[in-house]
């Protein structure tokens, strides 16, 4: 079992993004997916919300973790949060995550090489 929760502190944000091998973006939100028994990081997402839509910067598993279903749930939880803010458009950079996962979560390729949802 795992738990997905928003990161609450800058210290935890740096820990999560560093563990995932991604840069920590100023002002971005981060969700961490952790094992419920031992708190081990399983994956994370980093995103932003603006008036013109949300942006998914990263949807990454932790090194050595290969659990497509868990990553799918993390991706959908991230998009659900963005949607609940009233922002119904979301973009993702072409390198935001594995293409198969981004498509499964609901993104489709856009003309600029990234993805739209």
Question: What are these model-predicted stretches?
Answer:
Residues 1-26:
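Short amphipathic alpha-helix that is part of the acyltransferase structural core
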Residues 2, 28, 106-109:
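Short glycine-aromatic motifs
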Residues 31-69:
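Conserved donor-binding loop and adjoining core beta-sheet/short helix segment
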Residues 66-80:
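Conserved acetyl-CoA-binding loop-helix of GNAT-fold acetyltransferases
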Residues 80-83, 103:
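Non-catalytic positions within long, well-ordered alpha-helices that form the structural scaffold/packing
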Residues 82-95:
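Conserved GNAT acetyl-CoA-binding A-motif
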Residues 95-112:
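Conserved active-site alpha-helix within GNAT-family acetyltransferase domains
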Residues 114-117:
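Minor-groove-contacting beta-hairpin "wing" of winged helix-turn-helix DNA-binding domains
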